[in-house]
Design a protein with these regions (language model features):
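N-terminal Lys/Arg-rich, disordered targeting/topogenic segments
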Residues: 1-17
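A broad, low-specificity signal for short, low-complexity segments enriched in glycine/proline
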Residues: 9-14, 22-24, 77-82, 91-97, ...
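Hydrophobic membrane-insertion alpha-helices, especially the h-region
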Residues: 20-39
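Short extracytoplasmic
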Residues: 52-89
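Exposed beta-sheet edge and beta->alpha loop/turn motif
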Residues: 90-152
Length: 152
């Protein structure tokens, strides 16, 4: 086959190829955009579950979420650095936030520089001061954040 014997140009076939390429690029852009928007969904969900337990005043479940260990009561010695009693003083009705009636995740972001977790900002009881909780990416434990970020 020589150049002069080339197949005839088929505009329908070329149109289908172009449309397929446009569709693939559009889907890829949408997937990348959604992945970026929901990049902290898991961490936000963990914190939302934690605050749901606090709203129900189920402090043992909240502590299990904080430590990411549902069987924490079987081996409380492993958590001597932040025992349940200290947790209850911080997050119970007598703690900084008082009785938690409402909690709404306001945003999430990593701290500046290299970080191993995500800071989740929560509006508690519609106060102007926000609670901020650190979620460690590797094991999903919660703690107090190493930095403070301002969310709008």
């Amino acid at each position: 086959m020589t150049l002069l014997d080339a197949k005839e140009f088929d505009p329908e076939k070329e149109s289908r190829k172009r449309n397929r390429l446009i569709l693939i690029i559009t889907v890829a852009v949408i997937v990348i955009f959604l992945a970026w928007v929901f990049r902290y969904w898991r961490e936000e969900h963990i914190v939302r579950t934690f605050f749901d337990a606090l709203q129900k005043q189920d402090f043992k479940t909240a502590y299990a979420i904080w430590m990411h260990d549902p069987d924490w009561a079987r081996h409380p010695g492993e958590y001597a650095n932040y025992p349940f009693n200290d947790f209850y003083l911080d997050w119970g009705p007598g703690g900084k936030w008082g009785r938690i009636n409402t909690a709404r995740v306001n945003g999430a972001h990593t701290c500046p520089g290299p970080s191993s977790g995500v800071l989740v900002d929560v509006i508690v009881n519609d106060r102007t001061e926000h609670a901020q909780v650190w979620v460690e990416k590797s094991n999903h434990t919660l703690s107090y954040p190493p930095c403070e970020l301002i969310f709008r």
